[in-house]
Swiss-Prot record:
It is found in: Cytoplasm. It catalyses: a (3R)-hydroxyacyl-[ACP] + UDP-N-acetyl-alpha-D-glucosamine = a UDP-3-O-[(3R)-3-hydroxyacyl]-N-acetyl-alpha-D-glucosamine + holo-[ACP]. Keywords: Acyltransferase, Cytoplasm, Lipid A biosynthesis, Lipid biosynthesis, Lipid metabolism, Repeat, Transferase. The gene is lpxA. It comes from the Bacteria. This is Acyl-[acyl-carrier-protein]--UDP-N-acetylglucosamine O-acyltransferase. Involved in the biosynthesis of lipid A, a phosphorylated glycolipid that anchors the lipopolysaccharide to the outer membrane of the cell. GO terms for biological process: lipid A biosynthetic process. PANTHER family: ACYL-[ACYL-CARRIER-PROTEIN]--UDP-N-ACETYLGLUCOSAMINE O-ACYLTRANSFERASE (PTHR43480), ACYL-[ACYL-CARRIER-PROTEIN]--UDP-N-ACETYLGLUCOSAMINE O-ACYLTRANSFERASE, MITOCHONDRIAL-RELATED (PTHR43480:SF1). Pfam families: Acetyltransf_11, Hexapep. Its EC number is 2.3.1.129. Disulfide bonds: none annotated.
Length: 263
């Protein structure tokens, strides 16, 4: 038995067209389907299924029982070639499901680097997840959701299709998101998805200076507390954004919203 074969449990099934780096480990009763590529350092636990076309990067850990790269749960899907792209250094826990894209939605579902995707999370077709995100147990994304870097989804939270979640946002436990969530925003733990302030603790953990946090708080008050019509709030944010990249990011997010902004 060669060295690579010794890293693959004898009960695992590897399709002929799957491509595995020499040090990839495959656990018991796992199925790796056709057109799957897995890069170096990745560990696939027991009872996982990975269907292609799927590309998985370096140093990922699939703990077990995950269903990855399955067909999209979309009645419009007609078997067209679509794919799932997963980056590096992600941890994907038990019973996670991540589906491939659809032809009508761009054809790709993508997961970035350094994400923690915890048990029973579902990431649907055509979603795009950035880097350093956390999806706590039972979080769910409907199709076509875009999630920026450093976002945290608490347990049992979810996002409606086509929503965007801006960078550094925090989604509270059990919250259902049905609109775009601006960067830096904290959404309260209720089913209505109401903004409760900025993600102050998260920004501190990411080494935002007090000055940056103060400016973001001012922008939040302009958008949510002052009672201004959105058009007027955007005018004031444009003034605040002249010398502030964080507020520029916030304003650009608002101006490119595809769904109603959570307010």
């Amino acid at each position: 038995m060669n060295k690579h074969a010794s890293l693959i449990h004898p009960t695992a099934v590897i399709a002929p067209s799957a491509t595995l780096a020499p040090d990839v480990q495959i656990g018991a009763f796992t199925l790796i389907g056709n057109d799957v590529q897995i890069d170096t350092g990745t560990i696939i636990g027991s009872h996982c299924t990975i269907h292609g076309p799927t590309r998985i990067g370096r140093n990922n850990r699939f703990i077990g029982q995950a269903a990855i790269g399955g067909e999209p749960q979309d009645k419009k899907f007609a078997g067209e070639r679509t794919e799932l792209l997963i980056g590096d250094n992600n941890t994907i826990r038990e019973f996670v499901t991540i589906n491939r894209g659809t032809g009508g939605g761009g054809g790709v579902t993508s997961i970035g680097n350094d994400n923690w995707i915890l048990a029973y999370t579902h990431i649907a077709h055509d979603c795009h997840v950035g880097h350093h995100c956390v999806f706590s147990n039972n979080a769910s994304l409907a199709g076509h959701v875009t999630v920026g870097d450093w976002v945290i989804f608490s347990g049992f939270s979810g996002a409606h299709q086509f929503c965007r979640i801006g960078r550094y946002a925090f989604i509270g436990m059990g919250t259902l998101i049905n609109g775009d969530v601006p960067p830096f925003t904290l959404i309260g733990s209720d089913t209505l998805g109401r903004p409760r302030g900025i993600n102050n603790e998260g920004l501190k953990r990411r080494n935002f200076t007090p000055e940056r946090i103060t400016a973001i708080k001012r922008a939040y008050r302009t958008l949510y507390v002052a009672g201004l019509p959105l058009a007027e709030a955007k005018q004031q944010l444009a003034e605040q954004a002249k010398d502030n990249d964080d507020i520029k990011e916030l304003l650009q997010f608002i101006e490119t919203a595809q769904r109603p902004l959570l307010r």
